[in-house]
Amino acid sequence: MKQQHASGRVAAFFDLDGTLVARPSLERRFFAELRYRSAIPMGNYFSWLARAVWLAPCGMQMMLQANKMYLRGLPKDGRESHNGGQPPRHGSGQAKMAVPRFFPEGLEQVAWHAQQGHAIVLVSGTLEPLAQEMALALVVRLALRGITASVAVCATRLEQSGGRWTGRILGDAMFGEAKARAVAQLARCKGFDLTECYAYGDSLSDRSMLEAVGRPAAVNPSSRMERLARRRGWSVFTWREAKDLTQSSQRPAQRARRGDEPLLGSGRVG
């Protein structure tokens, strides 16, 4: 890796689900939390099904990614329940997702980028409010290490009306080509040199984003993603939850290095 003489022109783009945090996805966790709090009106399930039928010709992936009708009419701050007027099962009734833990090795990689002066950007198909919560949590975790950094977010935006979600999204769901377009647009606005930028993702929906930068890496990749990464000569990492680190540390870690770049976790190239 060449020494960075203009670190302000470099960004590190991170997917969230499966890359920085373990699955299930953030949206699935949020949906489960809403259901547990009885925050979803029964009619929203039928609205979701109707929307799914309408999107069916676009394929299963689009049917799931662009269909947020289960959120229709819900207040954006998550207050209120729809359980027959009974108090919510949790004190305040706020339907907010508990922030999951970041992979320790992923957090180390983010910290390294922040220390180099690289911009940190979360590029995720999850709902924008959830990605913003994760960005805030990431800023806090970095601050605990004495690192001051901001974290930008590119995620699936939700339409609002009168302080409530309509169930429709604004623009495209942040998957596939939409990720690459978001990265390119941000690069134009911020003056990033994409040939010097980094991107981390776990699935083929991240492929376009990884292809858009000069330093792509597959993290905890699906089998198809790993085959692609090997063909392209991309770095491949395995980042684990904290409970798995003791076991993994007993095996010699293979590390692929480019100059002074730390590649964390069980890393390999091609």
Question: What are these regions, as identified by a protein language model?
Answer:
Residues 62-108, 116:
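Metal-dependent phosphoesterase signature
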Residues 49-76, 152-159:
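Short, compositionally biased "basic patch" segments
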Residues 39-46, 76-81, 143-150, 194:
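Short, surface-exposed acidic
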Residues 2-3, 7-11, 93, 97-270:
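C-terminal cap/substrate-recognition subdomain and adjoining C-terminal extension
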